[in-house]
Amino acid sequence: HWYCPLEQYTSFIRAITDYSTGSYCLPGALLGTFLAALVVRGLGLTGNMARLLDCVAPGGALIVVFIRLSALFNSSCRSKIAITTPLLQHLPIGSGITNSMGAVEYRFATFFVQAILMLCVTVLLLYFFFARRRLPMKEGCPRDGNVAWMFLTFHSAVELLMDSTRYDSSFMHFNAFVSIVQIVSAVCILAVLIHYSRLSHKVNGRCGYHVAMWIGYVLTLVGTGASEYLVQRFGNMYPICYTVMTITCPMMAVIVYLMYQTTCA
């Protein structure tokens, strides 16, 4: 967060030591969780960091639910989509905010919808932890760490879609078009897909299934990227662009999950 709105901080040291000003960015919070796990392992409090992250993953998803709900009724939601239909000007679709002129206007309730989606991800991860995690894996494929990988995948898919619907102040200085959250989310999904592709290739050998999965991933990535470009360039293309992204973003996560299944015994 320090990198994005530099004007909020006097220095980097002040940003990481003075918490009375400024804000945070979710990718940084996730990185902090990973670093905390490294510290725990370094102190000898756990011998299996992957299993520790598996235990943390469902709670991490639930934390995002409360973070988004806590920011629902303030200016940090900053949804781009105006809700003009009176029937939709209430939760879960719309929420009222006070603009700079003191008037109330209704915007898409981005954080509320994201909280609902992350609650679904929490339930999915709990099922994955108590049921899927115990399934045997093919020789050479670790059983631990898969819940954390799935959290990274599905949380990133949700962020990739929902962050597009709001004005996010966290963007690269050389490119204000796509937010850092979206960039990190796309990279995370790609990293998890590469991880499971390598495992699957090691235990199953090279096959057409891998090619099909990667073609599907590229198509969904292109669909997501093109929709994001069009929705930023042409404001009146919200309906069609977000309809496409509502399909392609979850499909990216599903493709990762299907690749994971090829490593199960």
What feature does the model see in each segment?
Residues 1-265:
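Hydrophobic, membrane-interfacing alpha helices
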